[in-house]
């Protein structure tokens, strides 16, 4: 029993250390305990959906995962779809009943995409009167996470092993359009 508790405490310590490293790397004011990640998916330009993945204290919070059917666009429009989804998500924040996971304001938003997605979503968040940091997750030619996109550049994360693993998990655990 003590061994199991020690293992759990060790894992929790690593998760907190990873979140602290992510905070420092991104220049955040506070540790991002509640992170939301968004990814747009489509099937040959149709059936557009967005997945929202939530990590709380460095662990997946599957009960808060959401899928959004994209209603405003036919065909592939990742930037417009991100704007739509974040608008709908934060409308839920303001309008849902207490107890909804939408009533929790994230400490950090990570988007699948680079600077175009970040630049498109920042005004949406600001227009809603919210102050939530937004960054993108940039992939390499092999579709692996390579960097985090900031407003006008990128932060390489390959040398930050634990942060790299966390960000990769956020990106690749997105709910599938067929879930």
Name each model-derived stretch.
Residues 3-174:
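Acidic, glycine-enriched active-site microenvironments
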Residues 175-179:
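A short, hydrophobic C-terminal helix/tail in secreted or cell-surface proteins
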